[in-house]
Amino acid sequence: AIYAEARQLLDWNARNPFCAQCGQPTLSVNGGFKRTCPPKDLARTNSKSSSGVTNALSNVPEPPTDETARPPCATRKGVSNLSFPRTDPTVIMAVVNHAGDKILLGRSKRFPPYWYSTLAGFAEPAESIEEAVRREVYEESGILVGRVVIHSTQPWPYPANLMIGAVGQSIPEGEVIDLGNDPELEDAKWYSFEEVREALRVGTSGIGEEAGKDWKEGGLRLPPHTAIANQIITSVVCNGFVSGVPKM
């Protein structure tokens, strides 16, 4: 958690050195949790300070002069999301077929051979999590999802994602896979719960890691236990997460 917070704050501060409102350089304050657009150019003020302590660090604020004053900026008039770290909501979902005995998994070209995971994507402005799940699943796989249940969340600071895990269930007439809507996935398949349980036992690993010693060539591979994708897959195929909620 400490690493994730630090990673996200460092990345955000490095990417946002200028004010999005007026374009002037900003200052990192509050331990990196905020960037502020000051009313005067502190760099030029510091260079003209005759004391041993610069004006930027002085306890007595100096009024802006004509030489150091900056143009008016809306971010100084109140709380504004222009000055705070961004967090991008991202949906990641295990999709179960209507019969409740298969799970949809996909893979991109960068994945190792036989390595599959849950589908995922960014939520769009003014979109609910449930709507984002249905849209992303349809765009990437052509599957139509009805019921959506939010499962859990995981921060993912690469650079600023909040992974919102969900479980969706397809409608009977919308279970044919079609990758033609979006070229993001190389492949998507329906896997039986039995096959996925076996992969959870012997075939979990990170993308750049070797599969477990009991994994056999050609078998399904899945994300590691530390990933939210693994957690929602496990909840579905091993812990009966879907069966406890009535189907739509």
For every predicted segment, state its role.
Residues 81-85, 156, 180:
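Short Gly/Pro-enriched turn/cap motifs at secondary-structure boundaries
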Residues 117-151, 166, 174:
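The catalytic Nudix box helix
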